């Protein structure tokens, strides 16, 4: 927990009055089920103890003033509820702005403005969903301030819509869902097709989740992400000529092997294979956890990375280096890339008394091979977005 009192005094210095309430929204990591969401499959994310804090005070006029301690150089950004358009110079503030606009589009009344101080301890560009964390935070603040009585799943859907339509990023619903619906010590098995979900308790007996950040500047992810989506769509269309399915996620491994010869391009067949096998791996991983078999869960994580590396080809030297070093480290039962790929982070399950040596060794070897240092975060699984004061 960050020192809320320090944030409160920062708020008072900035806005000359005290904050009225405090909110927290977690980041998220996907434990397994990568690039399955848009293929009609399952994902298995959890919310994290790192995230975004917001201190809020209502105003009597229609103006919204926001400031982020993570972007101090931008100062206080101000906009009016009567002119809610995307403005490049507003930078990060377009995320909360998009959520406000989406709520209004759905007929919710936002009668007056407010002041918000944001502070996040999720590294930007790490792939741990700092943007979705801010979106669900803003939705939760609006729901609370104006007594809108919206359930969290609907807040989550509107936040995804804000990112799709206002920001213009074609994301699935996993990030916002994991952040809004998170539960302490549980991961969420989510079917992205139907939004059916269930919680699985993770008994981490003596183990911790360690996130390793490649610190690679992400440039490629968006273009390659769209390319992979279209490759899978083409493969699906070819399979649909012989099999009545709506999504790759509906196939078992055996069914895929029977129909894969319908896919004319071997590259697209590899992409579709990943989508099918990763979805089944995710269901097996959940079953392993329910049977307290953390070792099998770790092996399935490793298999997931191999599939993302060889069949889906979204890893790259930085992620592969972090993962292969983790696989050689004492006390690691599973390691894989997480997120879109081409940079970002890996997720590792590491024995608690091995964490220090794991970080030290992986950092040294990665730095000597790649030329710059990775970062590490030891995290726990958190509740979803909520008011904390």
UniProtKB/Swiss-Prot annotation:
Ligand binding (ATP): 68, 125-131
The keyword Metal-binding is assigned to this record: yes
EC identifiers of the protein: 2.7.1.6
PROSITE patterns for the chain: GALACTOKINASE, GHMP_KINASES_ATP
Catalytic machinery residues: 175 (proton acceptor)
Site features described as Transition state stabilizer, chain residue numbers: 28
Positions contributing to substrate binding: 34-37, 225
SUPFAM superfamilies, per database record: GHMP Kinase, C-terminal domain, Ribosomal protein S5 domain 2-like
Top-level class of the enzyme under EC nomenclature: transferase
Predominant subcellular localization, coarse grouping: cytoplasm
Catalytic activity field: alpha-D-galactose + ATP = alpha-D-galactose 1-phosphate + ADP + H(+)
Family per similarity comment: Belongs to the GHMP kinase family. GalK subfamily.
HAMAP family in alphabetical order: Galactokinase
Protein name (database record): Galactokinase
Gene coding for it: galK
């Amino acid at each position: 927990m960050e020192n809320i009192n320090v944030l409160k005094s920062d708020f008072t210095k900035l806005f000359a009055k005290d904050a009225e309430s405090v909110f927290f929204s977690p980041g998220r990591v996907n434990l397994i089920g990568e690039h399955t969401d848009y293929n009609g499959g399952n994902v298995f994310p959890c919310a994290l103890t790192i995230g975004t804090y917001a201190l809020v005070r209502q105003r009597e006029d229609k103006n919204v003033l926001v400031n982020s301690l993570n972007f101090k150089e931008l100062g206080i950004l101000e906009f009016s509820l009567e002119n809610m358009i995307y403005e490049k110079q507003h930078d990060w503030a377009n995320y909360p702005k998009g959520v406000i606009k989406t709520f209004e589009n759905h007929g919710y009344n936002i009668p007056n403005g407010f002041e918000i101080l944001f502070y996040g301890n999720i590294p930007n560009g790490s792939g741990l969903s700092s943007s979705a964390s801010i979106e669900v935070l803003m939705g939760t603040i609006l729901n609370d301030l104006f007594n809108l009585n919206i359930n969290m799943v609907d807040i989550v859907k509107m936040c995804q819509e804000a990112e799709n339509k206002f920001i213009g990023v074609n994301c699935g619903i996993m990030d916002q869902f994991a952040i809004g619906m998170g539960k302490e010590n549980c991961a969420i098995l989510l079917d992205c097709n139907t939004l059916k979900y269930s919680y699985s308790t993770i008994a981490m007996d003596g183990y911790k989740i360690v996130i390793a950040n490649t610190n690679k500047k992400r440039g490629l992810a968006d273009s390659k992400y769209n390319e992979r989506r279209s490759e899978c769509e083409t493969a699906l269309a070819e399979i649909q000529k012989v099999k009545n399915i709506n999504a790759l996620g509906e196939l078992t491994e055996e069914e895929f092997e029977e129909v894969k010869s319908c896919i004319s391009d071997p590259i697209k067949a590899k992409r579709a294979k990943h989508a099918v096998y990763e979805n089944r791996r995710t269901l097996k991983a959940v079953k392993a956890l329910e049977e307290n078999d953390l070792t099998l869960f770790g092996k399935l994580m490793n298999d997931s990375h191999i599939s993302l590396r060889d069949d889906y080809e979204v890893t790259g030297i930085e992620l592969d280096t972090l993962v292969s070093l983790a696989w050689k480290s004492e006390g690691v039962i599973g390691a894989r890339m997480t997120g879109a790929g081409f940079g970002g982070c890996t997720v590792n399950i590491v024995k608690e008394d091995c964490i220090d040596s794991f970080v030290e060794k992986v950092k040294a070897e990665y730095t000597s091979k790649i030329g710059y240092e990775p970062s590490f975060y030891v995290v726990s699984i958190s509740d979803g977005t909520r008011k904390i004061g």
